[in-house]
Amino acid sequence: MAEENQVATEEQQTPFEMQIQRIYIKDVSFEAPNLPNIFHQEWKPQLGFDLDTETREIGEDTYEVVLHINVQTTLEDSNDVAFICEVKQAGVFTIKGIEGIQLAHCLAAKCPEVLYPYARELISSLVNRGTFPALNLSPVNFDALFMDYLARQQAEENGESTTNTTLN
């Protein structure tokens, strides 16, 4: 009995461990289809921002997480596309000591939280190299996005209608 309690206690006290193995650019694209004509228009940009993540297990306790960010900027007056920037920032993470919803939270929120500053800097650099005014993307609350996702999943399981939450 004492041994069973000791084993159960040791299992409960397994420490959570997340290690970054590698961070890399998986795909990047920058398009400015209306250059140089767009430089003669008044700069009143409308920013479209789309964010998504993709996760896959690539080994025991090892996961690749890819953060997809698509930024499209159009001019308010003409609706001409100023630029489109698509980035897939990826990382390989070793995650031990958690499973289930905690693992899902780590993969959907904590790992993208690590990747986002890299993607944001890359997008800013690409926009700058296109000679457009500086683009500083706001921080993203990945924990809140994950909680929203869980709430929508729960509502769908209960047969309730849901509305999509979009980042703009």
UniProtKB/Swiss-Prot annotation:
InterPro entries: SecB, SecB-like_sf
GO terms, biological process: protein folding; protein tetramerization; protein transport
Cellular localisation: Cytoplasm
Main subcellular location: cytoplasm
GO cellular component: cytoplasm
UniProt keyword Transmembrane helix, yes or no: no
Family label: Belongs to the SecB family.
Quaternary data: Homotetramer, a dimer of dimers. One homotetramer interacts with 1 SecA dimer.
Function summary: One of the proteins required for the normal export of preproteins out of the cell cytoplasm. It is a molecular chaperone that binds to a subset of precursor proteins, maintaining them in a translocation-competent state. It also specifically binds to its receptor SecA.
Protein name: Protein-export protein SecB
Organism: Glaesserella parasuis serovar 5 (strain SH0165)
